[in-house]
């Protein structure tokens, strides 16, 4: 139809150039009416075959040139407000939400890392503080132990008497008592009652006085008092001697004749001690040794060993070890080899160290009496017996000369 109209318009144009005849004038008029109707309907003006344009400003045009509205084509009023790509808009919103979530998780991770670093720093500070406190405590313990050791070894001014106490006790009981310090533990003594300084000073002054003296006589007889260190040594020796006497008396067997022996021993000790105490002098070591040896000798007399068909064996009252080593008579008779508790008393034997088991001190012994010695054959026994006989004969010859 559009083609036919164009052909008609072309014919009309030809007719205008070449005036048609009257026979064709009716057709031309009819053709012009068709073009006017078309122009009124669509607003299309044809000026020529080469130039074609759309006239949308015609006054007679009641329609607007716009694309047809289809279900696929969006509404122009709404398309201007929204994007042309709804799927891309949804993906952009999703991307923004994902980006926000990523940023939130990143900041949360940074915060957790900062908290972890702070906790590690606090733990390191606590560990360093604990190590420093432990080192300070160890240093304090070492310093305290060194201080105590220095006080014990060197002896401070206030503990000067205590440092000499051990020396005096060792000198007084050397060779006559064992080195067991547990028997003279003074820690079990009852605690002293707290007194005013004045009464305590008077009591100390009264302790330094001889027996039978009154502390009120200090002002009149101040020149006859004992020095404080000397009185302290005397008190310590007296206490040690009382411990020895009480221990020896407590282990005496219950026999009818032991009461007289105990009374005799107590009388001897009291007379010997009364000399020193009456004069205000410290007890001599000889008096202590005499009292302890008398009790030891009495205990040895009460012991009767029944061996070899109940034959009584005499207990030696001298040191056999010193006798075998050709010591002087005074040394031999001054002590015995062992005490009532089977502890070594001989000072020379106490210093001997057994080459087999390494025993010394209270359990010191020679190789002959070593419990860990190897089995001796008959040849070894014969050699030892011959050596013993030769040695005894040699000593006898020396004694005769």
UniProtKB/Swiss-Prot annotation:
Subcellular location, record wording: Cytoplasm, Cytoplasmic ribonucleoprotein granule
One cellular component (GO) term of this entry: neuronal ribonucleoprotein granule
Biased composition range(s): Low complexity: 190-205
Tissue: Posterior part of the embryo. While the transcript is present throughout the embryo, nanos translation is controlled by smg, and the protein is found in pole plasm and pole cells. In the female ovary expressed in germline stem cells, precystoblasts and in maturing cystoblasts; in early cystoblasts expression is post-transcriptionally repressed by bam in a 3'UTR-dependent manner.
Zinc finger (Nanos-type): 318-372
Result when mutating residue 365 to Y: Strong defects in abdomen and oogenesis
Motif (C2HC 1): 319-346
Effect upon mutating residue 347 to S: Strong defects in abdomen and oogenesis
Binding site for Zn(2+) 2: 354, 357, 365, 370
Top-level taxon in the UniProt lineage: Eukaryota
Keywords carried by this UniProt record: Cytoplasm, Developmental protein, Differentiation, Metal-binding, Oogenesis, RNA-binding, Spermatogenesis, Translation regulation, Zinc, Zinc-finger
UniProt-annotated stretches for the region Disordered: 181-207
Result of changing residue 349 to R: Strong defects in abdomen and oogenesis
Effect of substituting residue 319 to Y: Strong defects in abdomen and oogenesis. Reduces binding of zinc. Complete loss of zinc-binding and loss of function
Residue numbers binding Zn(2+) 1: 319, 322, 335, 346
PANTHER family for the chain: NANOS PROTEIN
Family, as annotated: Belongs to the nanos family.
Function: Maternal RNA-binding protein that is required for germ cells proliferation and self-renewal. Acts by forming a complex with pum and brat that regulates translation and mRNA stability. The complex binds to the Nanos Response Element (NRE), a 16 bp sequence in the hb mRNA 3'-UTR and prevents its translation. Controls posterior development. Rescuing factor for the abdominal defect of posterior group mutants. The other posterior group genes are not required for nanos function but rather play a role in localization or distribution of nanos protein.
Domain remark text: The Nanos-type zinc finger is composed of two C2HC motifs, each motif binding one molecule of zinc. The presence of the zinc molecules is essential for the translation repression activity of the protein.
Protein name from the UniProt record: Protein nanos
Organism placement in taxonomy: Eukaryota, Metazoa, Ecdysozoa, Arthropoda, Hexapoda
UniProt gene name: nanos
């Amino acid at each position: 139809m559009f083609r036919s109209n164009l052909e008609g318009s072309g014919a009309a144009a030809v007719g205008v150039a070449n005036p048609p005849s009257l026979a064709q004038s009716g057709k031309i008029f009819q053709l012009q009416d068709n073009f006017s109707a078309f122009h009124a309907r669509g607003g299309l003006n044809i000026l020529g075959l080469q130039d074609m344009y759309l006239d949308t400003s015609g006054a007679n045009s009641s329609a607007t040139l716009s694309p047809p509205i289809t279900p696929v084509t969006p509404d122009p009023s709404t398309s201007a407000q929204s994007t042309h790509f709804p799927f891309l808009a949804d993906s952009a919103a999703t991307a923004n939400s994902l980006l926000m979530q990523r940023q939130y998780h990143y900041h949360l991770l940074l915060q957790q890392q900062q908290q972890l670093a702070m906790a590690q720093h606090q733990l390191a500070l606590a560990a360093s503080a604990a190590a420093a406190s432990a080192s300070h405590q160890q240093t304090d313990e070492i310093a305290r132990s060194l201080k105590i050791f220095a006080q014990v070894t060197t002896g401070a001014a206030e503990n000067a008497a205590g440092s000499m106490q051990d020396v005096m006790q060792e000198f007084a009981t050397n060779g006559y008592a064992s080195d067991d310090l547990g028997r003279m533990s003074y820690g079990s003594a009852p605690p002293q009652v707290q007194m005013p300084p004045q009464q305590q000073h008077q009591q100390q002054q009264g302790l330094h006085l001889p027996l039978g003296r009154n502390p009120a006589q200090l002002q009149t007889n101040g020149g006859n008092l004992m020095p404080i260190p000397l009185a302290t040594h005397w008190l310590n020796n007296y206490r040690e001697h009382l411990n020895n006497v009480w221990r020896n008396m407590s282990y005496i067997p219950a026999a009818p004749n032991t009461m007289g022996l105990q009374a005799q021993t107590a009388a001897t000790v009291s007379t010997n001690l009364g000399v020193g105490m009456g004069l205000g002098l410290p007890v001599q070591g000889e008096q202590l040794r005499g009292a302890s040896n008398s009790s030891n000798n009495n205990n040895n007399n009460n012991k009767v060993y029944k061996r070899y068909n109940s034959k009584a064996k005499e207990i030696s009252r001298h040191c056999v070890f010193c006798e075998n080593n050709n010591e002087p008579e005074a040394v031999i008779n001054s002590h015995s080899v062992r005490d009532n508790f089977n502890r070594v008393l001989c000072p020379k034997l106490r210093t001997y160290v057994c080459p087999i088991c390494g025993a010394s001190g209270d359990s010191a012994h020679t190789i002959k009496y070593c419990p860990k010695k190897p089995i001796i054959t008959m040849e070894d026994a014969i050699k030892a017996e011959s050596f013993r006989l030769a040695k005894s004969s040699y000593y006898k010859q020396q004694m005769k000369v």
